[in-house]
């Protein structure tokens, strides 16, 4: 099989169709049948599990071993990795992983490899391509709230821990909503980590180092078109 494409259709590179109604599709990799709102015009389809399998391994290995304490730096390295497409739920994993790794590496909080790995799996299960627009629930926002859920040990019977976790989601989701038009996972990751930085100070009393001079190198790759000057991270020198 040819190497998977990282832009548009993973199989042929064609621009994907975003549908108003779900259709039944079959994953070209594993054969699973399901309903989907996104497809290749030629008929190719890759399910969420197959779409993110290779990237999950890459992201997990990197965030578990990096010593970097600045969350944007961790995320930027991963977003440039060849296994990570321009758009996709892999960015939810990057957000959660970069945030947790930065917090752990700050030395002010202990987070085990097992807890970080389980968080990534939870985020992957709840992040579905296209649902950011269809349902208004972006997996990147879940990445930050899931990190808080792990750190605080939030469960349904708990009060403050669960409330903080939900507030984290709402605040990231609101910031992302103000950054929409068109959708851009790269921008959303940066926005989410910026909110995560503020949340860490507020709820965990941890002030992470943060790079305030991020400039995007992906502006010419967005199949929906770049927001350019409307984006906080736009660079005229973007590839």
Label for each model-derived stretch:
Residues 1-6, 15-23, 38-41:
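Short, flexible, mixed-charge glycine/proline-rich loop motifs
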Residues 6, 24-27, 37, 44, ...:
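Residues immediately within or flanking Cys/His clusters that coordinate Zn2+
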Residues 9-12, 27-30, 40, 47-50:
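Short cysteine-rich clusters marking metal-coordination/redox-active sites
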Residues 14-18, 35, 45, 55:
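Short functional micro-motifs and their immediate structural scaffolds
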Residues 37, 77-89, 125-136, 176-181:
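A short glycine/serine-rich beta->alpha loop
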Residues 61-97, 182:
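Polybasic, low-complexity association/targeting segments
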Residues 151, 158-201:
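A structural-propensity feature for long, helix-poor, extended segments
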């Amino acid at each position: 099989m040819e190497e998977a494409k990282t832009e548009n259709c993973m199989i042929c590179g064609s621009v994907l169709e975003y549908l108003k109604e779900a259709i039944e599709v079959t994953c070209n990799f594993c054969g699973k049948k399901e309903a989907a709102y996104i497809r290749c015009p030629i008929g190719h389809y890759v399910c969420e599990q197959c779409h993110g399998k290779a990237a999950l391994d890459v992201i997990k290995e990197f965030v578990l071993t990096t010593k970097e304490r600045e969350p944007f730096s961790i995320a930027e390295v991963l977003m440039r990795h060849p296994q990570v497409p321009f758009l996709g739920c892999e960015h939810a994993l990057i957000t959660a992983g970069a945030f947790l790794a930065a917090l752990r590496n700050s030395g002010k909080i202990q987070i085990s490899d097992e807890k970080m790995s389980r968080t990534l799996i939870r985020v992957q299960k709840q992040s579905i391509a296209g649902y950011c627009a269809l349902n208004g629930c972006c997996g990147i926002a879940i990445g930050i709230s899931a990190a808080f859920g792990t750190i605080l040990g939030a469960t349904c019977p708990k009060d403050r821990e669960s409330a903080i976790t939900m507030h984290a989601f709402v605040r990231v989701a609101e910031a992302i909503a103000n950054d929409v038009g068109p959708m851009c996972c790269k921008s959303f990751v940066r926005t989410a980590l910026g909110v995560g930085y503020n949340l860490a100070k507020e709820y965990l009393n941890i002030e992470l180092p943060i790079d305030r001079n991020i400039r995007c190198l992906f502006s010419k790759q967005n199949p929906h078109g770049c927001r350019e000057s409307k984006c906080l991270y736009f660079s005229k020198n973007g590839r």
